UniProtKB/Swiss-Prot annotation:
InterPro entries: Nicotian_synth (IPR004298), SAM-dependent_MTases_sf (IPR029063)
Family recorded in the similarity comment: Belongs to the nicotianamine synthase (NAS)-like family.
Function summary: Synthesizes nicotianamine, a polyamine which serves as a sensor for the physiological iron status within the plant, and/or might be involved in the transport of iron.
Taxon lineage: Eukaryota, Viridiplantae, Streptophyta, Embryophyta, Tracheophyta
UniProt keyword terms in alphabetical order: S-adenosyl-L-methionine, Transferase
Record-given protein name: Probable nicotianamine synthase 4
Species this chain originates from: Arabidopsis thaliana
Amino acid sequence: MGYCQDDQLVNKICDLYEKISKLETLKPCEDVDTLFKQLVSTCIPPNPNIDVTKMSENIQEMRSNLIKICGEAEGYLEHHFSSILTSFEDNPLHHLNLFPYYNNYLKLSKLEFDLLEQNLNGFVPRTVAFIGSGPLPLTSVVLASSHLKDSIFHNFDIDPSANMVAARLVSSDPDLSQRMFFHTVDIMDVTESLKGFDVVFLAALVGMDKKEKVKVVEHLEKHMSPGALLMLRSAHGPRAFLYPIVEPCDLEGFEVLSVYHPTDEVINSIVISRKLGEDANGVVHDHIDQASDLACNCSKIHVIMNKKKSIIEEFAGANEEQLT
C-alpha cells in the first residue's frame, strides 16, 4: 500500500481509501454508499490526539487524494438528490428530509447561526453570500428559511449545472424564490460585489488543499468590507481526512473570533472571523490585543467546553445594492 503507518485508525482509513479508489464510479450506488458510510463512521469519533498535519508525507498524500474523492462523491450525491427533489410537483423544499444527511445540515446551520448571532451584536445581516453552494444548497436554504428570514442570499458556484438544479429547487417556494439568487462564476473573478455582503460563508470544499484555501481567503480579504464576517468550515482530529483544515494563521487580515469543534455527528468545525480595517462608517475593526500574528499552535489557544460538550476555542478579541 505504501501509505499507512502503525496506527489502527489510520490503517483502517487507508484500507477504505484503497477500496474507494478502486470503485468504478463515485455516483450513488450500494458499493459507494457502503464504503463512504464506513469512512464517515471511522473518522467521526472525536480524537484530539490525531493530528494529520504531523503525519508522514505518504499519509498526507493519501489524505489529499481522499478529500478530493470525497468532494467528487459529495457532488454526485447532492446532484442525485436535488434531481429527485425537483421532480416533485409541489414545493421540493417540503421533501428535504429525503436527503440522508439533512439532519446534520439542520444542526450545522443552527450552530453556525448561533455563533453568528453571538458576534453580530444584534445586527441582522441584509445580504449573505455562500461560496461553493453546489446543487443542493442546504445551508443557504436552512439559514434563509429558519434563521435569517429577512436576509438576501447570493449563492456562488463555478458549476453551471449545479446552479441550474439548485435554482429549480427553490423556484417553487414563494419566499426563497424572492430572496435567493444563484451566480455561475469563479469566486476569484468576483471583486467589487464582495463588498456588498455582511456575511460570507465559504464552503468546506472550496479550496481542497492549504494553498488553494489560502488563495481564496486572501482574495476575500482583499475585497470584503471591513467589519464583515467570514464563516468557514474546517475539520478536527480524524475528521480532517474528510475535509480541509483551516487554521487561524491562514486568515491574515481577519480577526478570528471563535473556532468550534462539534463532537457529535456534525462533521465540520466552524471558524468565524471578522474582516479588519476601517468600514464605511469610519469604525476601525482591529485586533483588541493587537496580536496580529495569532499562532497556529493549538497549545496557545484557551480551550473550554460548552454546555453541549463540544469544544470551543475562544480567541482574544471581542453596501452595495442587491445583486441581480
